[in-house]
Amino acid sequence: MQNLNKTEKTFFGQPRGLLTLFQTEFWERFSYYGMRAILVYYLYALTTADNAGLGLPKAQAMAIVSIYGALVYLSTIVGGWVADRLLGASRTIFLGGILITLGHVALATPFGLSSLFVALFLIILGTGMLKPNISNMVGHLYSKDDSRRDTGFNIFVVGINMGSLIAPLIVGTVGQGVNYHLGFSLAAIGMIFALFAYWYGRLRHFPEIGREPSNPMDAKAKRNFIITLTIVLIVALIGFFLIYQASPANFINNFINVLSIIGIVVPIIYFVMMFTSKKVESDERRKLTAYIPLFLSAIVFWAIEEQSSTIIAVWGESRSNLNPTWFGFTFHIDPSWYQLLNPLFIVLLSPIFVRIWNKLGDRQPSTIVKFGLGLMLTGASYLIMTLPGLLNGTSGRASALWLVLMFAVQMAGELLVSPVGLSVSTKLAPVAFQSQMMAMWFLADSTSQAINAQITPIFKAATEVHFFAITGIIGIIVGIILLIIKKPILKLMGDVR
């Protein structure tokens, strides 16, 4: 950890290294959300269209995007482990950035499904290496008693939201309006900017932070790791081949099914590992039990929220009025632009929630109440999406304002769940499993998208109203259940609120 002189040259009163990490994450999120804004459209756009895509069925395209999201969050476990045991955070971040860049370059090439799967593999692995470690690097810029720490993280989050906000406008406009591969090229350029900002800034401002692994492997452990990794890769390749041989025509669907199972099983293994560990005390085991309903609730929340890049993206392209007339002026909307509504409402609503919590102080709702209310709002956002179909049927086009309203309500729900969930994950973590509990929070998102890979193909015009209604009601019911069982959960949580 770096000891910083508060009189040195700063970035908004913060360590200069924060500017480097701010810029790196800004451009990384720009590339990630820019690519994600057009990915599903590229997958199902006709191969004969002027702006040709891969021509996959919409159901399969949505499943691929979902499983991609699941694996991105699953890979954060690998990224954290590589930084802690092998390379150190600094080199892991840079290597991750290189892999992401190569992935976007692969997407920019017109080689069909082959380049798609190579690209997604590289981006998944690279994001897993970069995402968890760059947040840890922010923390290492400060001493434990530095009062600037929380403000520094807030500034860092602003960089994330800024990159997420402008990406759909730039990458989406070029990708959908001109050429998908050109859009992916812009995402690659964004990652090149991220790499340059990180490489240059790290050398100048924090050359020693994260340089070495915090828990390095000895020679014997490295040898065992190489042997294990080799075996895993061989088994994976054999499994890949067997899945293909079983049914070449259904290979993609079968592969998605296998990955969905992995995404669901991994968190179960993690929970069993922690519950059965001799390093976990009885009091910690009670707190871990309290985390289970929160984890399951988080899966429901993220399952709805993450459908913005699949179901909501498809609805926006096929069902919303893309040429609305407002105040006498006719506008054109690229469907990918809807993806900016998520970060936009996060930016707009965050100060309101911060002010409310500051005003309430110790009187603010408990974690369980916030979770429950957040889930109810998230479920309500999908009930809103039933109204266009109920009022005017599902064959025509509806106002884009339905999506604006849906995102506004859903992001209010996210601000009640996401920051609280991240915080409570650390508070309820057993001492011996602090980092693993942070991974568990990411795994909730991973599991939700693994489930989405199975349920999003159900969505079509004929099922639109029922899908939104059932999914929304599930979210509301889970929120209500949390409020009902609040007392026993709080009892298990002990002094954590």
UniProtKB/Swiss-Prot annotation:
Name of the gene encoding the protein in the UniProt record: dtpT
Residue intervals on the Extracellular side: 56-64, 112-115, 174-181, 244-254, 313-335, 392-425
Protein name per its UniProtKB record: Di-/tripeptide transporter
GO cellular component: a single term: plasma membrane
Pfam family, one: PTR2
Residues that span the membrane, as ranges: 37-55, 65-83, 93-111, 116-134, 155-173, 182-200, 225-243, 255-273, 294-312, 336-354, 373-391, 426-444
PANTHER family: PROTON-DEPENDENT OLIGOPEPTIDE FAMILY TRANSPORT PROTEIN, RESISTANCE PROTEIN MDTM, PUTATIVE-RELATED-RELATED
Cytoplasmic topology ranges: 1-36, 84-92, 135-154, 201-224, 274-293, 355-372, 445-497
Annotated function: Proton-dependent uptake of di- or tri-peptides.
Record's bilayer topology term: Multi-pass membrane protein
Record InterPro entries: Dipep/tripep_permease, MFS_dom, MFS_trans_sf, MFS_Transporters, POT_fam, PTR2_symporter_CS
UniProt-annotated location(s): Cell membrane
Keywords: Cell membrane, Membrane, Peptide transport, Protein transport, Transmembrane, Transmembrane helix, Transport
PROSITE patterns in the record: MFS, PTR2_1, PTR2_2
Organism of this sequence: Lactococcus lactis subsp. cremoris (strain MG1363)
Example GO BP: oligopeptide transport
Family indicated by similarity: Belongs to the major facilitator superfamily. Proton-dependent oligopeptide transporter (POT/PTR) (TC 2.A.17) family.
